[in-house]
């Protein structure tokens, strides 16, 4: 596990304690019991792929620990509308405050502005956060295998599905993938960024894709920058993508998405 991830996870444990002191778990559980149905994140991804289209999870991200502020002019609702118009299948919204300058409010703003299913992009380590995601309005949560023990992975994914949430399980290497496929969730993300060096190589996805069961949706994450990158993935039967920084640095994120995935010569 990388030093930055260790730092983030230590902070998350404190954050959960702080939040549960303000809003007790029992209250969150009660509030989660009578909510509208989620929008169907995994189903939307599967439908795009079945139609022969790339399934794009477009990320709403202001900053990152490695890059600092990526998008100073940051308006989540406008970005969400732009992404939907540009052809995104789903959204990913960063809610981590301390390391990514995210916010729960950003998720609500983005989701309220469009009809797309939304992933809460955060470091989920405790059942409290799963209930919290459901109450916030998320349709899917992220579980990072390198941050969790097998029992946590099983418990958190099981709770999420019980609450009607989809789960994207993220891996970085073959050992993590072997653990991930034991969890009965339809979405497996392969992060092309090495957590120790922060280097990005698309070869990570290509090397691991054959080990992903055919009944799962393989989502390639990080490093998709050019149409050639997209074509490389699609020619290797990788049809689901999570892209953030490339779009966030563009004046019009949705137009950047359209050009990258849907503009053909």
Curated annotation (Swiss-Prot):
The lineage of its organism: Bacteria, Pseudomonadati, Pseudomonadota, Gammaproteobacteria, Lysobacterales. Belongs to the TrpC family. It catalyses: 1-(2-carboxyphenylamino)-1-deoxy-D-ribulose 5-phosphate + H(+) = (1S,2R)-1-C-(indol-3-yl)glycerol 3-phosphate + CO2 + H2O. This is Indole-3-glycerol phosphate synthase. Keywords: Amino-acid biosynthesis, Aromatic amino acid biosynthesis, Decarboxylase, Lyase, Tryptophan biosynthesis. One of its GO terms (molecular function) is phosphoribosylanthranilate isomerase activity. Signal peptide: none annotated. It comes from Xanthomonas oryzae pv. oryzae (strain PXO99A). It is an enzyme of class 4 (lyase). The keyword Signal does not apply. It holds the Pfam family IGPS. The keyword Glycoprotein does not apply. GO terms for biological process: L-tryptophan biosynthetic process. Pathway: Amino-acid biosynthesis; L-tryptophan biosynthesis; L-tryptophan from chorismate: step 4/5. Its EC number is 4.1.1.48. The gene is trpC. PROSITE patterns: IGPS.
């Amino acid at each position: 596990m990388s030093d930055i991830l260790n730092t983030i996870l230590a902070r998350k444990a404190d954050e959960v304690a702080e939040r549960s002191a303000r809003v007790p778990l029992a209250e969150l559980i009660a509030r989660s019991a009578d909510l509208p149905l989620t929008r169907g994140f995994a189903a939307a991804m599967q439908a795009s792929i079945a139609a022969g289209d790339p399934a794009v999870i477009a990320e709403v991200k202001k900053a990152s620990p490695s890059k600092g502020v990526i998008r100073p002019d940051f308006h989540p609702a406008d970005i969400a509308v732009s992404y939907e118009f540009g052809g995104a299948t789903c959204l990913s919204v960063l809610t981590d405050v301390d390391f990514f300058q995210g916010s729960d409010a950003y998720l609500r703003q983005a989701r309220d502005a469009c009809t797309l299913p939304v992933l809460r992009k955060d470091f989920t380590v405790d059942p409290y956060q799963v209930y919290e995601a459901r109450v916030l309005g998320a349709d899917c949560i992220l579980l990072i295998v390198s941050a969790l023990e097998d029992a946590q992975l099983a418990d958190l994914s099981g709770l999420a599905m019980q609450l009607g949430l989809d789960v994207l399980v993220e891996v970085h290497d073959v050992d993590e993938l072997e653990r991930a496929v034991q969890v009965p969730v339809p979405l497996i993300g392969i992060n092309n960024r090495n957590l120790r060096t922060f280097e990005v190589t698309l070869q990570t996805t290509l090397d691991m894709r054959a080990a992903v069961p055919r009944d799962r949706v393989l989502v390639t994450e990080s490093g998709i920058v050019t149409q050639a990158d997209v074509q490389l993935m699609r020619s290797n039967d990788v049809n689901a993508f999570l892209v953030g920084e490339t779009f966030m640095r563009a004046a019009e994120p949705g137009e950047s998405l359209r050009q990258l995935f849907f503009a053909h010569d």
